[in-house]
Regions:
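Residues forming the flavin
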Residues: 1-308
Length: 308
């Protein structure tokens, strides 16, 4: 929040910021656009679309309306893992957010760790009405927990004729919501034993969970291939972090990372429609907060040069 406040304080005297106003659509032609909101219409010669991952569907509609080409992209499906912080402490004490990538022997798929949160909490996330799982940690030592959490994600890239990778991820997340009323949680030991984690088994875990979730069976939600990949990855991680494959390791599901179809933009992040820019994670070009932020700065500099 402090970072956002600092940004707001810096720009508030230089630009107009509209709060509580939703953009409905963009119409127009090259260097002549109308941005339509639920309250007003704004005219401009340059329009920047940066709606994030959650706005990927809307960005696709904008691109289709303007005839801007898109390429099919991927969706990442997996779980949020929660373990005692001591298991990964020898890694997180040196690399706060380690990025570990593993290619499975069974399928040759890539599985990666993502969003490492030492001494953090598992949380829920609402994306277009679908409840998925995420995680965070606090800068304040007083708010630390005894656990570390991170995502294990399997990347899925589809070929013809299937094009809607986001719909694939949404369907899996909706199934989890249907079975558990939200987020499901399962002990790793129960998963590999082929049994559901019920309230009794969940109550026997030595780990103190940081999220209230519904004990269940992730094998009824996540497709076999992705689940096999995740299990293999956990055993691989156990070799560098003993205790990872413990029976009480908690797996929360599902975690889904949506990516927009990669929008056809040039080196300046400008589409074939002159004056219309698409950037950030919603463009399918960037895949992180830092990259998305950098793309915004880059586009702003590019546009400002037009007026110099």
């Amino acid at each position: 929040m402090q970072i956002l406040q600092n940004i707001y304080d810096f720009v508030k005297g230089k630009i107009d910021i509209k709060f509580y106003e939703s953009v409905q659509g963009i119409t127009g032609k090259e260097n002549d656009f109308t941005v339509i909101t639920d309250k007003d219409e704004y005219h401009c010669s340059n329009a920047v679309v940066a709606a994030g991952r959650s706005g990927s569907k809307w960005i696709s509609e904008i691109c289709d309306n303007f005839g801007i080409k898109r390429r099919s992209n991927r969706v990442d499906i997996g779980v949020r893992v929660e373990i005692p912080a001591a298991v990964f402490e020898h890694i997180t004490s040196k690399v706060y957010e380690s990025k570990i990538v593993y290619r499975t022997k069974k399928y040759g798929d890539l599985v990666r760790t993502f969003c490492m949160n030492p001494y953090g909490e598992v949380v829920t996330e609402n994306t277009n009405g679908i409840i998925t799982v995420n995680g965070h940690s606090y800068a304040d030592p007083a708010l630390r927990t005894e656990n570390t959490n991170f995502a294990l994600l399997v990347s899925n890239t589809f070929s013809e004729p299937f094009k809607d990778s986001n719909a694939y991820g949404e369907s899996i997340a909706r199934l989890s919501n249907m079975l558990g009323g939200g987020v499901l949680v399962q002990r790793f030991g129960d998963l590999v034993a082929g049994r559901r984690t019920n309230e009794h088994r969940f109550g026997q875990t030595f780990l103190n969970p940081t999220l209230k979730a519904t004990p269940g069976d992730l094998s009824l939600v996540i497709p076999k291939r992705q689940l096999d990949d995740i299990i293999e990855m956990i055993y691989a991680l156990d070799k560098i972090a003993p205790g990872m494959a413990n029976i009480d390791t908690l797996l929360y599901g599902v975690e889904v990372k949506f990516y927009n179809s990669r929008v056809d933009v040039d080196e300046n992040l400008e589409t074939a429609v002159k004056g219309l820019y698409v950037l950030g994670d919603g463009s399918g070009v960037t895949h992180s907060l830092s990259q998305a932020s950098a793309s915004g700065v880059f586009a702003a500099r590019t546009i400002s040069e037009k007026f110099n």
